[in-house]
Amino acid sequence: MTITTNDLTELQAIAEAGAAQLGPDATAEQLLQWTAETFGSDFIIAANMQDAVLIDVADKAIEDKNAVGGKLKALFLDTGYHFAETLGTRDAVAQVYDLDLHNVTPEHTVAEQDQLVGKNLFASDAAQCCNLRKVVPLRGALAPFRAWVTGIRRVEAPTRANAPLISFDDAF
């Protein structure tokens, strides 16, 4: 069954049902198969290059690419602060896995942002910098999709230690 609703209450219920169905110990493969079966082509994998393994797992777990629109969709959030090697890895991963890569950028370049709000906003107001360079562009990029898969790791921070396998995030 492929879900075609944009109703936030219904999407939240789908997330809760999926979490109950899969349980907290489901594998990444099981989660990705459930996501493809549930959302079809209306999901995207949001991955930075530390999460490139997620692309590999999805490529192997979702054998029928027609079920997801022919290609896996992946989102790379280019904040303007990445090393050249990171961008090279992004491009190589997209080529190796034949992805529909959505390269998402903020409204302004780093230089333009420096002109508008001052240099090194990340040092003077990290929350505002994160909002401008990550949150706002991510909201726009995720708007066409009903679901997204991320590679957050529970070991990254105490706030992620109990991150559920499937959740509903009304911020996006």
Cite the ranges covered by each PLM segment.
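ATP-dependent adenylation/nucleotidyltransferase module used to activate substrates
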Residues: T2-F172
